[in-house]
Amino acid sequence: MAASVENRQFSHIEAGLSRSFKPRSDSPVRGCNFPPPNSTNFQKKPNSTIFLDYSSSEDDDDDDEKNEYLQMIKKGNSELEPSVHDSRDEGTADNWIERNFSLIRLTGKHPFNSEPPLNRLMHHGFITPVPLHYVRNHGPVPKGTWDDWTVEVTGLVKRPMKFTMDQLVNEFPSRELPVTLVCAGNRRKEQNMVKQTIGFNWGAAAVSTTVWRGVPLRALLKRYGVFSKNKGALNVCFEGADVLPGGGGSKYGTSIKKEFAMDPARDIIIAYMQNGEKLAPDHGFPVRMIIPGFIGGRMVKWIKRIIVTTQESDSYYHFKDNRVLPPHVDAELANTEAWWYKPEYIINELNINSVITTPCHEEILPINAWTTQRPYTLRGYSYSGGGKKVTRVEVTLDGGETWQVCTLDHPEKPTKYGKYWCWCFWSLEVEVLDLLSAKEIAVRAWDETLNTQPEKLIWNVMGMMNNCWFRVKMNVCKPHKGEIGIVFEHPTQPGNQSGGWMAKERHLEISAEAPPTLKKSISTPFMNTASKMYSMSEVRKHSSADSAWIIVHGHIYDATRFLKDHPGGSDSILINAGTDCTEEFDAIHSDKAKKLLEEFRIGELLTTGYTSDSPGNSVHGSSSFSSFLAPIKELVPAQRSVALIPREKIPCKLIDKQSISPDVRKFRFALPSEDQVLGLPVGKHIFLCAVIDDKLCMRAYTPTSTIDEVGYFELVVKIYFKGIHPKFPNGGQMSQYLDSLQLGSFLDVKGPLGHIEYQGKGNFLVHGKQKFAKKLAMIAGGTGITPVYQVMQAILKDPEDDTEMYVVYANRTEDDILLKEELDSWAEKIPERVKVWYVVQDSIKEGWKYSLGFISEAILREHIPEPSHTTLALACGPPPMIQFAVNPNLEKMGYDIKDSLLVF
């Protein structure tokens, strides 16, 4: 922890650090000259004049302002370390993109969503270096080239056509101006601390300002003859190139009203340059929308189509993103009552907001005879939407009883229409003794329409537009022996980083709500209490079946006594034992399971104390960029004979995809090394992991390839499309995501998991206990055939394994039967050992020789063996099938379902 009172001001004209880096070889315009040099082959002589519209003045002030921005860009680039290929992008579709290592990742490895450390963002002042600009990606970054990229203008226009990038640059007037971009989820983690939203944890740095150059949208639409309002032209829709899983596979798209698009005062541009360079891949290369004063979600990147329509965009992301619904509406209610489609809740313009950036999180201000003789300067940023000027920022040290008006710094001048498109900065000198007597600092801003920020947080299901007073808490501490100081705490830290006063208060609230009864833990010698604190190193020691601890949302649970009762088998717990498995737990467990977890809580995770090298170290004292470096990974051998590594996710590349039927696909994924086998025991399964709509999604699958295949594994997957089954209108989240994957895409795989393992020659290991059978009654429903198929494969591959198999396989229709060709082939070639019987609810084909309806006692009696000490039943299918068809009918036949039925 930095203990310093050098209250340094980072204004936009401050001299840069004495540091320089060589320009990248692929970036000839590293110096950010305006316009870029001809050597880039980027811009030919334009047919219309390029003009700068920074302000309303008509004199040399424009040139002065342009030069000032240029100096800021040069200064920022000179202080910035080069972007690199981040090891965290290895195995993802974004592995070709260079990124700044200090960006804080908010959604794991992929997709890339990030914000800079708040102190680094503020260090650069008004203009943000492009590598530090926050990033919001819904999926992989599309690849494209300048020469091949086209944008289509269509819909209600007289002359629909496509234009190239060279045409955009050379045949249209351009405009260049600084614009602040803000994600509507800025400060969302504060909302997640109150109640979890459906969004990930943005901190307070989802905001950046750069200089954008592009063609005014109104000029483009005029050129192509946009129709009038009377002829139905009411909206302008934008569609990107990125193919995303939402809605069963769709492009990112949204729309704005046509009067916005045609309003010259709104300065809406189709941008192709940022800070004097071509757009970076993460920011929309080669072309994107910039809509000043609007939320970032309306500014479509990698734009491919502009459509003038009567109706607003029908994109999944236009309706299911960027809405502020009333606080009582949760995700379930929003879906059942169609709240997403109510136009009054859409977000367009930004709201008024302000943040305290100095003091930074965990900064310490020593209290002594010297520091108390000079004021301390509080600092921060503020912005508003719609071009409205921030006119006042106020700070309170007494909970809102009194307010002090801050000094404002507006580095931009208004446009000729009086608009302000950028953030501003505020500062206030306060007496140190006043800070010592206060408990918190709070800030609020006002804009020219006299809108201000609410005192209290207003929760909404998407966690959007949080703009309550930003509060920094203060506590007295002892940074050194014989010395006292004030330690400052921000409300949260971005992403999954620990820290912040809201996290502490949440833990205290949960502890107060915990039941008073004490529960004895099997694996720990003490009584369980919610208040006991453990370090991460202590948790890591409990990673075995003898003592299995897990961390979920900062709470520590001893799951040892639940190992034998877990529906997915002990492997499902042990694969995460000794780790923080918050994301994975939330991805695969219901609310009921989350409530059951509380019984096993033994304490809380001890967060990092106040140290000078913490992530939020003060920018006022000595700091090093090393604090932003990712942990150095331990070197491991590059080649392994087995791909799966317990407790780790491995990236696997999609190398082949075949359509077996309209809704069945066979996927082949390459393992990390060509000489590896997957390493999945027969009978167990793997998890496929993907971030879909900003949340981790994990689903269990059993490969259909044999266990000894080298270099790859295969999955046969039924795709559950949206709008097909009335009970599941959105379809299957993971199966639709898989169907949308392009060849070359990567997917994370984790395993092995499961409580059943077939060891050959009729031997099974179930929950660690041996079982044996000469005959197997194999009952499957739908996609539940895959683990049964896997066991059959292993048996038939071993010439010494003479286990008999009797398969009853249920589906809705004949077309839903998976792997039928393979099953029928085995039954035909080895009829004495393999018998297969199908059950379908409805048959539309003539000559159907199998059963109709549902699995019944009569069907089972006819097609599976009678119970005996050498007979086991294996079952996999939907829970209702197991509960209402398999269990009762096997019991009627005399099976001991507790001992002789194995359910995958």
Swiss-Prot record:
Gene Ontology biological process terms in this record: nitrate assimilation; nitric oxide biosynthetic process
Binding-site positions, FAD: 699-702, 716-721, 728, 733-735, 786
Top-level EC class as recorded in UniProt: oxidoreductase
Name of a matching Pfam family: NAD_binding_1
Membrane-crossing residue ranges in chain numbering: none
EC number of this enzyme: 1.7.1.1
Catalytic reaction list: nitrite + NAD(+) + H2O = nitrate + NADH + H(+)
Domain named FAD-binding FR-type: residues: 647-759
Subunit and interaction comment: Homodimer.
Name of the molecule in the record: Nitrate reductase [NADH] 1
Gene that encodes it: NIA1
